[in-house]
Amino acid sequence: MAKGQSLQDPFLNALRRERVPVSIYLVNGIKLQGQVESFDQFVILLKNTVSQMVYKHAISTVVPSRPFNVSNHQATNAQAGYNAQHDETDEK
């Protein structure tokens, strides 16, 4: 497994498993919303009213709508950072 995917795969899998609604921002600024239905090395299948295949190279940011559990230790640390960031935002 490539080093870059050691965080990506558990993160996306937890989003899929827990059916967490996400906002996906593309590099061109477009915002897509839905749930991660499936993913592989190159694409994410995003389901809303329709299913869309989104190429990962076109994605800038994936933003979960709520906290969720990630089983991978590295991913858990990233989730803690996500929670801390949103706690700061909520206080403003």
UniProtKB/Swiss-Prot annotation:
InterPro entries: Hfq, LSM_dom_sf, Sm. GO terms for biological process: regulation of DNA-templated transcription; regulation of RNA stability; regulation of translation, ncRNA-mediated. Residues 9-68 form the Sm domain. GO terms for cellular component: cytosol. GO terms for molecular function: RNA binding. The keyword Cell wall biogenesis/degradation does not apply. Keywords: RNA-binding, Stress response. Belongs to the Hfq family. Homohexamer. RNA chaperone that binds small regulatory RNA (sRNAs) and mRNAs to facilitate mRNA translational regulation in response to envelope stress, environmental stress and changes in metabolite concentrations. Also binds with high specificity to tRNAs. This is RNA-binding protein Hfq. The lineage of its organism: Bacteria, Pseudomonadati, Pseudomonadota, Gammaproteobacteria, Alteromonadales.
